[in-house]
A protein has these predicted regions:
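Short, conserved, GDST-rich strand-edge loop motifs in beta-rich repeat architectures
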Residues: 20-24, 69-87, 129-141
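Intrinsically disordered, low-complexity segments enriched in Gly and acidic/Ser/Thr residues
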Residues: 120-167
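Conserved blade-ending motifs and adjacent loop-strand segments that build the rim/top face
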Residues: 101-117, 150-178
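Post-signal peptide N-terminal segment of secreted/secretory-pathway proteins
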Residues: 1-27
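Beta-propeller blade signature
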Residues: 29-41, 82-99, 140-154
């Protein structure tokens, strides 16, 4: 792919690499692509429905057939020159059937923010966790938040961490390691 800042995951179902969205050559992307692990060949996935083009969004695996995609920054046309904006919406997608469903969208936020590349999903509590940071200034900060998958209600879980946001040169992600 010619774009960066896409979301990615290794499928628990077929062990292939999937990517969504991203940014490149002054365009925001909303393609779903699959890399076959045994062939090193990319294939565009035909989705039924669409998610507006974006980057700086979070993706997490909800189940074997379901991923969640939250937030981001982009424009409905994909064109940077038309004035991008922040997204605060949550989508559920099945990369195997191509089904996409919008679960909810939050109102414009007082302080604009984008999110880390990954989210951690807790299906027992019906929450997802991601790192959030303002994308309207370079001296920024990261904060861990939880969001209710049903309605988008959020809660800040920790103090902030200083973060030098430098647009396409900035990257953060979130990982979870189960304690045995």
């Amino acid at each position: 792919p010619i774009h960066t800042h896409h979301n990615s995951f290794i499928s628990p179902k077929d062990s292939n690499l999937y990517i969504f969205g991203g940014y490149g050559e002054y365009h925001y992307k909303n393609d779903f692509l699959k890399l076959y692990s045994d062939e090193s060949k990319w294939e565009k996935i035909d989705m039924k429905g669409s998610i507006p083009p974006r980057y700086l969004s979070a993706l997490g695996i909800k189940s074997e057939n379901s991923i969640l995609i939250f937030g981001g920054y982009g424009h409905i046309s994909g064109l940077q020159e038309l004035g991008p904006y922040n997204y605060y919406d949550l989508y559920e997608a099945d990369p195997y059937t191509g089904k996409i469903k919008k679960l909810w969208s939050l109102d414009k936020q007082e302080e604009p923010f984008v999110v880390s590349n990954a989210m951690i999903i807790d299906t027992t509590e019906n929450l997802f966790y991601t790192l959030c940071f303002p994308n309207n200034r370079s001296n920024s900060h990261i904060v861990l938040k939880s969001f209710d998958i049903s309605n988008g209600n959020s809660r800040t879980l920790a103090d902030t961490i200083p973060y030098p946001f430098e647009d396409i040169n900035a990257y953060c992600s979130l990982f979870y390691s189960k304690k045995d």
